[in-house]
Every structure is written in structure tokens, then in C-alpha cells.
């Protein structure tokens, strides 16, 4: 109950877009769903018990469970500012979309784009993998606004 209350409290702080909805291939608030088809959310945005450390901690994105090798799509056009490896995220990519927005795509098997590349909305920028701190193939997807993470589900829609 405490976790649910904290998630509700935090979600109230996040800017949301007004009521747009669409299919997995549509855009909400200008952001495209980052996979070619809808999949299950395996870990939500907000406080949770971390599946590996077993500690109560903040999860700054949404985990979409998908088959290894599934294409990852650029949620919005922009310039790749990071294509790197980290212990937690494994191989990951960050795209700067301008107007204060950027997006992160983690746990890829490798980086398919390079820093400085301009990518277009819907372009394949990588593939689902399980590198870094991961319990199985999935896409960890984060949207940042002015450097702070926001709930991606307020910007994209699964339905």
C-alpha cells in the first residue's frame, strides 16, 4: 500500500498530456511507442522492490518485456547524444529531441547507432536484449524532461 501511495504521489508531479490515445503504432504527445507492437509492462515507473538488489528503490522508466532481437524504435526524432555501455543499463542509447526532452533505451545487445547520428521517429535504433542488470530480455525506456525523468506512459500509449 505504501508503494502504491508513493507512486500515486509521484505521478501527480509529472507533467501529463491531455487524453490522446492510439494504437501501438501511434503517437501520444509527439512520442511514438518504442516497439513495433504492444507488449507487457514487466516493471512500472516509480518506487518498487528492485528485482536484483531486493531493495526499495526508484525505477526511472518503464520496462517492456519483449523477445530478444525485437526492433527498438526512436520514440521521436532527434540526435543521439549517448551510445554506450554501463553496468546497470548494459548497452544503451540516449536521444535528444530538443525542447528539453530526451529518451533512453537500455539493455540492448549492442549499440546500433552512434553519437551524433540524427534519427527519425519510428527508425530502428537498436534491438531488445538483456545486458547490464537484467533478469531477461526487455526494453528499459525512460523519457526525461529538462533533465528529470517523467513517466513515459504519460507520453506514449500501449492501446
Q: PLM features: residue spans?
A:
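Alpha-helical oligomerization segments with coiled-coil/rod-like character
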Residues: 1-29
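Catalytic cores of peptidoglycan-degrading enzymes
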Residues: 27-159
Amino acid at each position: 500500500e505504501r508503494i502504491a501511495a508513493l507512486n500515486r504521489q509521484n505521478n501527480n508531479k509529472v507533467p501529463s498530456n491531455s487524453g490522446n490515445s492510439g494504437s501501438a503504432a501511434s503517437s501520444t504527445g509527439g512520442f511514438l511507442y518504442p516497439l513495433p507492437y504492444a507488449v507487457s509492462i514487466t516493471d512500472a515507473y516509480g518506487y518498487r522492490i528492485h528485482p536484483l538488489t531486493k531493495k526499495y528503490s526508484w525505477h526511472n522508466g518503464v520496462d517492456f518485456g519483449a523477445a530478444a532481437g525485437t526492433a527498438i524504435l526512436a520514440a521521436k526524432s532527434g540526435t543521439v547524444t549517448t551510445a554506450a555501455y554501463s553496468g546497470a543499463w548494459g548497452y544503451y542509447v540516449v536521444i535528444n529531441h530538443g525542447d528539453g526532452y530526451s529518451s533512453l533505451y537500455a539493455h540492448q545487445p549492442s549499440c546500433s547507432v552512434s553519437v551524433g547520428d540524427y534519427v527519425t521517429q519510428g527508425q530502428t535504433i537498436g534491438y531488445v536484449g538483456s545486458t547490464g542488470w537484467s533478469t531477461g530480455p526487455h526494453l528499459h525506456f525512460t523519457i526525461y524532461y529538462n533533465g528529470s525523468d517523467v513517466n513515459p506512459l504519460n507520453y506514449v500509449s500501449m492501446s
